[in-house]
């Protein structure tokens, strides 16, 4: 199968892009799929530079680099949205390109045959109206985010409401939202996955001492971990407020992600927990962060799946998430994870953290159950489900 894939970037430091990298590797390797990847940036994925288009059936990933521009996200997206389609039109018109299908992880083009839905901007737009993040307190930033979410919501209306476009959701929650907003009742659930060769209790424990020493965490300190690129959406305000109720306990918080730490440091200072927080930018070696932690906590306000939660589970960490995270549908509350019904419920989060802090045996049992539960989320199974979706779409 000759497949055009459209994504602004691919790497292994962001949830959607990591999932795409794992998928493309397996479609090329396991199903001999010839993938033409139209993207502005590609990292940590083995790709070939296309010299010419041919009718051969050799599987592989061929990167067609699409230029990018600096500036606000909305302008960057508009440029990307139109240019990637122009590049594909040029390749088909003048270079002999031919694609059986066009696949997109989310809203990236108007002509995708299949869209794997990782985030819904209708829902994110609703959340942005309900609360204001400390990282976007300025009027211009709020206006820009509102305009950006509004534009993508209109594109979702146009694309996701079209029954000719095959959709897949990464969680039952996302499938329910697609039905709510677009009346789509034909959406299969294809959950994301975890690579056990990268994330496991054995690998985490082997690096624990070094990872904690690097950050000067003491042996008697319980370290909470939160990973994400939108800390407000991942529930950081709730976690910081919960820390204020654990002042009698030796608890630290490690926050990792591509967000602006300055306003969050200020919030932590106002809450009196600044000395308990460590802020880090994302890196390719994300296992190092899991190795330093004792509990993964992310009471997300909205999360289509929750890759860091799944990776934390695979590492054998007890996890706390919210019912607003897609991964919650796969958890047994109190067995292989803890689920907050309300992501803003600071009191309940503090109580659950206090319970985990005081019961190392419970942490161990829950972490072991979490690791066992994560074993069923494999990238090979994910790729097989997507391949079946591709086959159905190509035969229609």
Residue map of PLM features:
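Short hydrophobic beta-strand element within catalytic cores of glycosyltransferases
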Residues: 318-321, 331
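A short, well-ordered alpha-helix in the C-terminal region of glycosyltransferases
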Residues: 210-213, 362-376
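A conserved mid-protein helix/loop that constitutes part of the nucleotide-sugar donor-binding site
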Residues: 17-22, 222-245, 262
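Membrane-proximal helix-turn-helix segments that form the acceptor-binding/catalytic region
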Residues: 139, 144-168
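Carbohydrate-associated surface elements
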Residues: 173, 193
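Short, structured helix-loop element that forms part of the nucleotide-activated donor/catalytic region
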Residues: 209, 230, 252-275, 362
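Aromatic "clamp/platform" in nucleotide-sugar-dependent glycosyltransferases that forms part
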Residues: 282, 301
């Amino acid at each position: 199968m000759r497949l055009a894939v459209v994504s602004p970037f691919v790497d292994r430091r962001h949830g959607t892009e990591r999932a795409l990298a794992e998928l493309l590797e397996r479609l090329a390797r396991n199903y001999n799929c010839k993938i033409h990847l139209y993207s502005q940036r590609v990292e940590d994925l083995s790709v070939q530079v296309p010299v010419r288009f041919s009718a051969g059936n050799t599987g592989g990933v061929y990167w067609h680099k699409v230029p990018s521009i600096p500036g606000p996200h909305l302008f960057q997206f508009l440029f990307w949205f139109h240019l990637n389609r122009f590049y594909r039109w040029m390749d088909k018109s003048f270079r002999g390109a031919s694609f059986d299908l066009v696949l997109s992880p989310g809203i990236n083009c108007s002509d995708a045959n299949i869209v794997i839905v990782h985030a819904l901007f209708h829902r994110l737009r609703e959340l942005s109206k309900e609360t204001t993040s400390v990282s976007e307190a300025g009027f211009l930033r709020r206006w820009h985010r509102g305009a950006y979410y509004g534009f993508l919501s209109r594109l979702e209306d146009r694309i996701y409401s079209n029954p000719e476009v095959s959709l897949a959701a990464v969680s039952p929650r996302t499938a329910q939202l697609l039905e709510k907003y677009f009346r789509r009742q034909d959406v299969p659930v294809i959950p994301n996955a975890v690579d056990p060769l990268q994330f496991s209790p054995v690998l985490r424990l082997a690096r624990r001492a070094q990872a904690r020493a690097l950050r000067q965490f003491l042996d008697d300190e319980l370290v909470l971990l939160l990973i994400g690129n939108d800390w407000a959406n991942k529930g950081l305000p709730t976690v910081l407020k919960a820390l204020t109720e654990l002042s009698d306990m030796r608890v630290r918080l490690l926050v990792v992600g591509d967000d602006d730490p300055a306003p969050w440091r200020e919030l932590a200072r106002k809450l009196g927990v600044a000395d308990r927080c460590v802020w880090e930018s994302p890196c390719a070696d994300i296992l190092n962060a899991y190795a330093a932690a004792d509990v993964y906590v992310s009471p997300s306000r909205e999360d289509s799946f929750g890759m860091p939660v799944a990776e934390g589970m695979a590492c054998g960490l007890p996890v706390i998430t919210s019912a607003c995270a897609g991964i919650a549908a796969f958890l047994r509350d109190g067995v292989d994870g803890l689920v907050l019904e309300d992501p803003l419920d600071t009191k309940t989060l503090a109580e659950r953290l206090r319970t985990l802090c005081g019961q190392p045996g419970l942490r161990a049992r829950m972490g072991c159950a979490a690791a066992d539960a994560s074993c069923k989320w494999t990238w090979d199974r994910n790729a097989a489900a997507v391949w079946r979706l591709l086959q159905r779409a190509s035969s229609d």
